[in-house]
């Protein structure tokens, strides 16, 4: 994606790219009306297939609870993927509306000067960097989980599967059955990987616009401060009590800052409402997967679960890290408003500014179940809880 293109064109291309990935799974979130096609039903079949085989393996554990625990290892990933798929199906119109709204902001503001143009472009660059990190992480995890069974088979003949479920009628001791099981699990992992990646992208496409709007608020505050400083300079050159030109422009800039902060607040509220369940499912399901992986490896080392522990921790941490970055953006918004040269405002303008200042003290943070903020601090609390619960389970085992 060339940086010589306009920000709106880059954003439009990025939206289409993410939509092309979700379209592989049968969900076209840019379409005015969601239609089920063969890809949609294939995705539904893959989810049902994985769920059925996992339940079968858990119930047919041969009396060994560890086998059932290993089979349930990737239920966290199941909830994770199911949450994203259902969000696309049930909230398709809201997702589309939010993307088109962001597109309209890019179309409007890219022509308002170099400051806005640079701010919009920097957001696209930031999102592309996040996409690269997510993509590399998932590709590495997929390749590792795919190559591990082959490596162990070639090393000492041990037959393990990337995913811990068994298929009825296909014993792993039989060469043909092992190959069929391996291929079916590979297809399932491909669907899962594309779903995880595309799901993360459309969530991050929405979340990163909070950073963009925060940066644009800084630009607007700078424009207001420049006008107020110019007023102070003019006042030093004229006699006491004389009127100073530019009052209408200063009023317009102040109202522009107030309106933009209201837009910023409304957008944060809309994002929270749209992805409230999805973000909670993402973080908590990955926490569940980490706990199961940790418990399995406490009894004896199990390579697939150890790898999935790293994948789950990675998947949870990218959301929590972005949540912390968003918290810094809220602080940035409040600091920008506090830095307004308020003493150059008129009496009526100060009243308006007072309302703005009070509103900025209560940002709409991204929440997990309305209890915990999405942040690295919450991730550390979850990790401590996982360790405590795992120790308790092992002591009772």
From Swiss-Prot:
- GO (cellular component) term, any one: dendrite membrane
One Pfam entry for this protein is 7tm_6
Membrane topology recorded in Swiss-Prot or TrEMBL: Multi-pass membrane protein
For this UniProt entry, which segments traverse the membrane?
40-60, 71-90, 137-157, 187-207, 283-299, 306-326, 366-386
Record's keyword annotation contains Calcium: no
Superkingdom as given in the UniProt entry = Eukaryota
Membrane topology (Extracellular): 61-70, 158-186, 300-305, 387-397
Keyword Endoplasmic reticulum, does the record have it? no
**Subunit structure, briefly?**
Interacts with Orco. Complexes exist early in the endomembrane system in olfactory sensory neurons (OSNs), coupling these complexes to the conserved ciliary trafficking pathway.
- Extra remark: The atypical heteromeric and topological design of the odorant receptors appears to be an insect-specific solution for odor recognition, making the OR/Orco complex an attractive target for the development of highly selective insect repellents to disrupt olfactory-mediated host-seeking behaviors of insect disease vectors. Odor-evoked OR currents are independent of known G-protein-coupled second messenger pathways.
Under what name is this protein listed?
A: Putative odorant receptor 83c
